Regions:
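Conserved non-cysteine loop/helix-boundary elements of the Radical SAM core domain that shape
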Residues: 41-45
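Glycine-rich, highly charged phosphate/nucleotide-binding loops
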Residues: 46-51
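Active-site PLP-lysine loop of aminotransferase-like
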Residues: 125
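Short, conserved phosphate-binding/catalytic loop or strand-edge motifs used
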Residues: 128
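Surface-exposed amphipathic alpha-helical tracts and adjacent flexible/coil segments at the periphery
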Residues: 1-24, 29-40, 54-55, 61-71, ...
Length: 811
């Protein structure tokens, strides 16, 4: 049995310098975005015109190139997206990394042979989700960062998919593809590459109505960075790719991280020197953790003291003498290094600067290191106070060393084998890189009178590959007693290297079938009927209130799914229909939760994951399935896909503004859309449990004592708004926007578009508030109330006011 291939080292590239840094430091593949439709819109990214040369370089160096097209695409953008994809395909990518399943359909229709990788934005956490991905032509999935190695092992045992995991870099506190915070608070969508990083901002914790004093801990949902270099041996047999986050980071970061993970993969038993770890910390670090790979530990994931890149910890100020600060070093320090003083208020403009001098025992030195006690001075910086922490934020010498690794072609080279043989009176030489072969000849050969060509001599001459990307690996010579002038041999070597470069750069190309989008677009039908109101309830009291308001479609999303069994008979007794929501995230070993929801006896299910779709289609084909917002349906290709898989109707993506919403409704059957017209937007959806992290000493659900059952908690933001925190049955937390949003002003227009299903979502309303809210929207749909009037009433009656949400946002 052949040994399993080692996982690839997959490096990020936000610009061309990062590409070079990745290549020269041993990356097997790089991933990068174009200037639109990628999840790192703030990166420099690449123009379409740059792609042919970029892919030619990557092919030459034997490095794969993956294009991230990993955002949602709206209906009114699909034609442009198709034209863009045609240009990318013409450049010869090795794979696309995708979020939008409609775009996967489009690419597969355009060029069926193109490899597709499911982005972490698809929130893939279970093998059940991979059934649909396989149908769409995906061969690899980038797993959610919230999975442990044990969970990855379970997934691996149940699928033949290639698995990719993030091994290093920044961690999102929310599940990728499920974070609506930037959209809710700033009108800029993380699903469109415009994350505003609200997780890196300070929050106060309000417990049962009172501010909890947490000291300096303000950054309650800002996780440490992932660093899994020591876990690589455990991942080697599970994944095909180790991914480094960082398309917004520097080339030096790419160089340092790539070479570290290259070493980890090449030598699974490798240990890492202090200097190697310090280099990782220096290029970018908020502090390192294994993330969720080692299992859940809510106490370790978030420290809460700072959201900033800190670099390397040097020590604490032990004394101040004039402009000098004294510290016992934990890491190297030298003149020219950049430092910052940390006094526990990272939101302030912290003092710091370049170190001008370092003294050890009153003598100036060029370098000091642990455990030296030193004094140092910083140019034009006020003196610190005793007890302040000191961080080294930059190390110019280290950055010069890292930059030197990619400023010239001196790093990873392509191995070449040579065959040298006689062909009549000619010398024939063949170069092979394992895929391509080039041949050349020179001569005429001469009988050797004194010094015939030897294998060692040929290796010496043919191995002088200089600035080419090649290195001679094996050489086989089949020669008699002959010789050839060295000038001819050198000329032949140069020509063969040039020929090999040319064939390696060549674009194999993809045959693109025209008209793909037109073939996929179905002519929409139109389902007629009276407007229907569904109310999503979060407690049994909410259910009673909605029924009292005359609502006949009840949807339930309870923290405790055991209480579904109390809600179902209440609803059925009134002749109404009830739909139950399983937890949004489904992991290996959690099928029991889905079965418990089914056992409550609902009329249907709110499908919030493709795992739900797979399970309930098989286990209960009689149920009515409603696709929820978390499926991220933003265009007709995605919507039609889900509806064709058994959904009765589908909630469109919350990322759509009014213009984009209209474009979608024009391309689908609007009678099969269910539109949420009132809600508190679910912003962060997290594996990290704030309840456990702060209100207990527990690491996870097994030892936290479930403070979520005993306390009402909100997070108070920088504007004074208090956002509700809820935990579901899987202990995953959701933070809901404090300010409700209403689309009452758009309801009349939606009816004109053909929309027939509307939803109102409750959160923490009292039974009377819930009843009145349901009644107001029921009256609106029945024409007894005006949308503008209802908007004003809601705005006046709510302490926090009300917003229009994404529909009111202009692009």
């Amino acid at each position: 049995m052949s040994a399993r291939p080692r996982p690839e080292v997959l490096a990020p590239a936000g610009d061309m310098d990062c590409v070079r840094a990745a290549i020269e430091n041993g990356a097997d593949a790089v991933y990068f975005g174009i200037q639109k439709w990628n999840a790192r819109a703030r990166a420099t990214n690449f123009a379409l015109e740059e792609l042919p040369d970029l892919f030619a370089l990557l092919r030459l160096r034997g490095v794969k190139g993956y294009v991230t097209f990993n955002t949602l695409v709206f209906s009114n953008e699909l034609d442009e997206a198709q034209r863009t994809l045609e240009k990318i395909l013409a450049a010869g990518p090795d794979a696309f990394i995708l979020q939008d399943l409609g775009i996967a359909r489009l690419i597969h229709e355009m060029a069926p042979g193109v490899p597709l990788h499911a982005s972490t934005q698809t929130t893939t956490t279970a093998p059940e989700q991979m059934e649909l991905l396989k149908e769409l032509g995906f061969s690899r999935v980038v797993l959610a960062r919230e999975l442990s190695i044990a969970e990855i092992r379970k997934i691996k045992s149940q699928t033949d998919f290639d698995l990719e995991v993030f091994a290093h870099g920044a961690l999102c506190v929310a599940y990728s593809g499920q974070c609506l915070t930037s959209e809710a608070l700033g009108g800029r969508s993380a699903n469109r590459g415009a994350c505003a990083q609200a997780c890196r901002l300070p929050y106060d914790l309000i417990v049962d109505g009172k501010v909890r004093d947490l000291g300096d801990k303000k950054y309650l949902i800002s996780p440490l960075d992932l660093a899994a270099y020591e876990l690589v041996p455990e991942l080697m047999d599970l994944v095909v790719s180790l991914k480094i986050e960082g398309r917004l980071k520097t080339p030096e970061y790419v160089a340092a991280t790539t070479r570290t993970y290259r070493k980890a993969v090449d030598n699974a038993a490798a240990t890492f020197s202090r200097d190697e770890v310090l280099a990782l910390q220096q290029v970018f670090s908020r502090g390192f953790s294994p993330g969720f790979l080692s299992g859940t530990n809510h106490q370790a994931l978030v420290q809460g003291l700072s959201p900033k890149k800190r670099g390397v910890f040097l020590g604490k100020v032990s004394g101040v003498r004039g402009s000098r600060a004294a510290v016992t070093l934990e890491a190297p320090l030298k003149p020219g290094d950049g430092i910052v003083y940390d006094y526990g208020k990272p939101q302030d403009d912290e003092p710091g600067g370049r170190v001008s001098y370092v003294w050890r025992r009153n003598a100036r030195v060029d370098l000091a290191d642990r455990p030296d006690s030193v004094e140092f001075e910083v140019w034009e910086c006020p003196p610190p106070q005793v007890g302040w922490k000191v961080w080294k934020t930059s190390d110019p010498a280290m950055y010069r060393e890292l930059r030197a690794t990619f400023e010239k072609t001196t790093g990873a080279r392509v191995p070449v084998d040579a065959l040298v043989e006689e062909d009549g009176d000619k010398l024939r030489v063949t170069f092979s890189d394992g895929v391509h072969r080039v041949k050349g000849e020179t001569g005429p050969l001469q009988a050797a009178l004194k010094r015939p060509l030897t294998t060692d001599y040929l290796r010496q001459q043919l191995g002088r590959m200089g600035s080419t990307p090649f290195e001679l690996r094996n050489l086989e010579a089949k020669l008699g007693q002959v010789m050839v002038p060295v000038s001819l041999l050198n000329d032949l070597r140069r020509r063969l290297c040039e020929d090999l470069e040319k064939v390696r750069r060549a674009n194999p190309g993809y045959a693109v079938r025209p008209g793909a989008l037109d073939r996929l677009r179905a002519k929409p039908s139109r389902t007629e009927g009276e407007p229907q109101l569904a109310v999503l309830c979060r407690t049994v009291d909410h259910v009673r209130a909605a029924l009292e308001a005359g609502v006949s479609w009840i949807e339930c999303d309870f923290d405790d799914i055991r209480k579904y069994r109390d809600a179902v008979p209440l609803v059925r007794a009134q002749g109404a229909a009830i739909f139950l929501a399983p937890p949004r995230i489904h992991k290996p070993g959690e099928l029991g939760i889905l079965r418990n929801v089914l056992g409550a006896g609902p009329n249907g299910i709110l499908v919030r994951s493709t795992a739900h779709l797979s399970f309930y289609r098989k286990e209960a084909p009689y149920l009515v399935l409603i696709g929820d917002f978390s499926l991220n349906a933003a265009n007709e290709l995605t919507t039609d896909l889900y509806l064709s898989k058994g959904l009765a109707r589908l909630v469109p993506s919350y990322d759509l503004n009014w213009e984009q919403f209209q474009a979608l409704m024009a391309r689908i059957d609007p009678g099969r859309a269910e539109v949420v017209i009132h809600q508190h937007m679910p912003m962060f959806h997290m594996e990290h449990c704030v309840f456990a992290a702060i209100l207990s000493n527990g690491k996870d659900a097994t030892d936290c004592g479930r403070p979520c059952d005993r306390h009402a908690v909100t997070l108070k933001d920088w504007t004074g708004k208090e956002h509700a925190l809820k935990a579901d049955v899987g202990c995953r937390n959701t933070i809901f926007n404090a300010v409700p949003q209403s689309s009452s002003q758009y309801v009349r227009k939606m009816l004109d578009l053909g929309v027939r299903w509307f939803r109102v979502e409750l959160l923490q309303e009292s039974p009377e508030e819930a009843r009145q809210l349901a009644l107001n929207y029921r009256n609106l749909l029945e024409g007894k109330e005006n949308g503008e009037t209802l908007w004003r009433e809601l705005r006046a009656s709510n302490f926090m006011g009300v917003t229009r949400g994404p529909l009111g946002r202009e692009e």
